[in-house]
Amino acid sequence: MLITLLISLILLSRGKADFTLEIYRELLSALSKKGYQFMTFEQYCQLKASLPKKFVILRHDVDLKAINSLQTAQVEHELGVKASYYFRVVPQSNQPEIIRAIAALGHEIGYHYEDMAIADGNVEIAIAHFQEQLAYF
């Protein structure tokens, strides 16, 4: 509830949706000031039995412009925030130098899988494709 309210207030504060890094920085700062702890998906899984009362899992699916994700990761790093970045294995997203740079900032890297869609619903092909792609990461 509070997160929805914060997002609404920040993004609509200027009368229109604003998805700039400046506004994202404000959102992260506001959540931090309200006592929210940020964690990666892996941290969430590890802490399940003892999660803090207020927490945010930041998960980013990198679909198109990987450079934008690097800029987002840099903002998070400056604020001491860790996030999870899931990359597709397509040219727009799969840029190893950017993936390494985001990982070097301390963020979690994962495979944004879409194997069933790629395999057109064929489970055997999807599993084989998944194993191939997962080995990449």
Task: List where the protein language model places each region.
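Catalytic alpha-helical scaffold of carbohydrate-active enzymes acting on polysaccharides/glycoconjugates
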Residues: 1-137
